[in-house]
């Protein structure tokens, strides 16, 4: 991944030039580089961890269409597994991520070079105290959706807004057995700014292991997983 950040960053320098056709071209190049990075990392993980990932993706999707997508969220590994699941089947997933994650250099660079937005998640109490906060997130997501419209993309958000844990599930008193209460604000905004979209892809990630940490993923403990998708 670090190797691909260098050419991605160089490719995106000319984006400061206000030329629509140039931005479309550079966006296409960035997406191709990102897909190549996903393929390379998947191959490396297959060699290192003997992956047993089963991806069940609808046959009626393609890489030349715009989509909105969502999924359950259990681990940091979800992000890469979903990227691998969608590779060469749908356009590159564009994740809406928590703004706090922008302080991690590699995440910041990846998101900026492939037009993935950071959103500040405000609590209901914060928005009630300051309604302007809702407008800030709305404008950020709307700008991202506008950029997505340049090239085929899959605007993606974890419906729960955070990773599932038994503790969070109990605290929310969620009506769902294996899900937290959904938060679909980012997807709703993205949809309003992407008139090309007419299909929602609903992903479900299932792991064989009870382990969920990033370290577990790197050690190969999440090498058995299934991804189901439906439209």
Give names to the regions the model predicted:
Residues 40-67:
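A short, well-structured juxtamembrane/interface segment
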Residues 45-48, 95, 131-136:
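Short, flexible loop segments at the rims of nucleotide/cofactor-binding pockets, characterized by
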Residues 102-122, 149-231:
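A cross-family acyltransferase "interaction/gating" segment
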Residues 126-136, 170-177:
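Short, flexible/disordered intra-domain loops and linkers
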């Amino acid at each position: 991944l670090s190797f691909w950040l260098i050419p991605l960053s160089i490719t995106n320098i000319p984006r400061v030039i206000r030329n629509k056709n140039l931005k479309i071209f550079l966006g296409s190049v960035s997406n191709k580089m990102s897909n190549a990075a996903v393929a390379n990392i998947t191959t490396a993980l297959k060699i290192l961890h003997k992956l047993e990932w089963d991806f069940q993706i609808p046959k009626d999707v393609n890489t030349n269409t715009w989509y909105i997508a969502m999924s359950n969220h259990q681990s940091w590994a979800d992000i890469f597994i979903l990227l691998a699941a969608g590779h060469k089947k749908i356009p590159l997933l564009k994740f809406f991520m928590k703004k706090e994650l922008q302080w991690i250099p590699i995440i910041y660079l990846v998101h900026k070079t492939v037009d993935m937005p950071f959103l500040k998640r405000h609590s209901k109490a914060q928005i009630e105290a300051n309604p302007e906060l809702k407008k800030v997130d709305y404008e950020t997501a709307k700008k991202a959706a506008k950029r997505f419209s340049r090239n085929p993309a899959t605007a993606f958000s974890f419906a729960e807004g955070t990773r599932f844990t038994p503790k969070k599930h109990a605290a929310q008193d969620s009506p769902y057995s294996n899900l937290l209460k959904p938060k679909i604000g980012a997807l709703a905004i993205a949809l309003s700014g992407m008139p090309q979209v007419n299909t929602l892809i609903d992903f479900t990630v299932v792991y064989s292991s009870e382990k969920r940490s990033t370290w577990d993923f790197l050690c190969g403990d999440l090498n058995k997983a299934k991804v189901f998708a439906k439209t």
